Amino acid sequence: MALLPYQVIPNDWDEFYSEQVQESLLESLDTFYHQPLLDSQQTIGATDFVALDIETTGLNAQQDDIVSIGLVPFDHQRIYLAKAKHWVVSSHRLTPESVMVHGITHTDVAQAPSLKSVLPEIMESLQGKQVVVHYRYMEREFMRTAVAELCQQNFLFPVIDTLEIEARYLRENQTLMARFMNKQLPSLRLLYARERYHLPAYENHNALVDALATAELLQAQIANHQLTK
């Protein structure tokens, strides 16, 4: 199987999914790619979302590990916390610096299952839903790289990126002079993006909490910007 290079995204998602169905060697991945992609004309109100967040040992998907994954299913009005999922997974690359950020310790990862062992449940939770992240170059690239390393398989999916939505609307609301001077946008970090919609402050760097925060942010963006598709 030809693995797509780091950060390369398919031009045609339907074609990519069809190719992966033919080439997949994992039952869970085969099932994932058999699920049809959401119709591009489907309305927001008819869409099932799942917010994905991860915690890692660093910022480089090719050098660092995932140590925690959080998933929160939701729609444009409701969040289904009873169906939310959270995993801490094993890693040999944990550093004192990363422990200070997310609070996941060597003891936690030593007692945790491997990422490979929980991948089928993660894939099942994502399949058939529109995945939502805050900064796709973290969540999607880390998941893609991990599956490529562990299973020698492609694991890619379309995402809605709340950071990109926020950046787009902030640019649109800039004054002409600010655009001309290439003035820097306000912070796009999840915490500050939420503040602009008067959402409550949550604990940072917990994968489950950040997934919830991302879900709430998209709901606020949908409502405030009257997004329909």
Predicted regions mapped to residue ranges:
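Long, acidic (Asp/Glu-rich), low-complexity accessory segments flanking structured domains
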Residues: 1-15, 25-26
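Conserved non-catalytic scaffold segment of RNase H-like nuclease domains
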Residues: 15-52, 56-157, 181-205
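Short alpha-helix plus adjacent loop in nuclease-associated cores
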Residues: 160-182
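Generic recognition of well-ordered alpha-helical segments
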Residues: 165-168, 193, 217
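Alpha-helical transmembrane segments that form the membrane-embedded catalytic/substrate-binding core
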Residues: 208-217
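The feature marks non-catalytic terminal segments
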Residues: 219-229
